[in-house]
């Protein structure tokens, strides 16, 4: 009897990620939260910022991080700057811009609990939120594994391959863009099948916009569609009032 395929997806532990991120969780047997790679010394990335609809426009919402260190550090060592009132600021922005969304009363208390997680660790904060959101939209959060807990080293493609092998994966679910012939050959040489995600962003009803804005945090879909229909959107299913 042939061995069953074990699909692995790998991504940094993002801050309230977009729908495509959760589609990867839905399609993978193991979803590895890559907290063992470097956080940029300057600026930010999807680990501490994401876009919400604010004043009818896609705007960055950011969790500030401590910048007192003098070297590049892995995400797992990055601390949130809890000396600033960023939690209050984000919640006020949500109240102001999503207060009239159809599912605001259901989602806001849930979101408040996630944002008010008192941890200093950006990894702990994001991993907890990703797991809670996965549960809320009926995804299996037990498939989430932190990369830093695995015996896997290397850089770039080599690190990805070693992480896939560390959990016994036989296939790697990657984003829609091609990784390049030479990189693909590395996976093939290790007997790992490449699967391209090709997630088609759904168009769902949004509050206070004339034209749909894609690529926002899952929070936008939750506020406008609720837990159940957001789960359907993640799975690629249609919901009332939405179109692909």
Task: List each model region and its residues.
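Residues lining hydrophobic/aromatic ligand-binding pockets adjacent to catalytic sites
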Residues: 1-244
């Amino acid at each position: 009897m042939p061995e069953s395929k074990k699909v692995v997806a790998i991504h940094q532990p993002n801050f309230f990620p977009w729908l495509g991120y959760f589609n990867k969780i839905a399609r993978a047997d193991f979803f590895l939260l890559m907290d063992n790679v470097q956080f940029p010394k300057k600026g930010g990335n999807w680990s501490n910022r994401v876009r919400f609809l604010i004043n009818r426009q896609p705007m960055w919402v950011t969790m500030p991080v401590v910048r007192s260190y003098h070297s590049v550090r892995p995400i797992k060592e990055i601390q949130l700057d809890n000396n600033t009132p960023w939690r209050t600021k984000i919640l006020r922005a949500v109240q102001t811009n999503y207060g009239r969304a159809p599912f605001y009363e259901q989602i806001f208390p849930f979101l408040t609990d996630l944002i008010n997680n008192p941890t200093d660790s950006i990894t702990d904060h994001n991993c907890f939120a990703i797991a809670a959101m996965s549960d809320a939209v009926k995804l299996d959060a037990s498939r989430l594994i932190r990369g830093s807990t695995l015996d896997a080293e290397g850089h770039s493609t080599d690190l990805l391959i070693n992480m896939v092998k560390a959990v016994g994966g036989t296939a790697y679910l990657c984003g829609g863009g091609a990784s390049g012939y030479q990189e693909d050959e590395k996976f093939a040489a290790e007997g790992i099948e490449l699967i391209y995600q090709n997630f088609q962003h759904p168009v769902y009803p949004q509050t206070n916009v004339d034209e749909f804005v894609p690529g926002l945090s899952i929070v936008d879909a939750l506020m406008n569609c609720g837990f159940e229909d957001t789960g359907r959107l993640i799975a690629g299913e249609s919901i009332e009032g939405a179109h692909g």
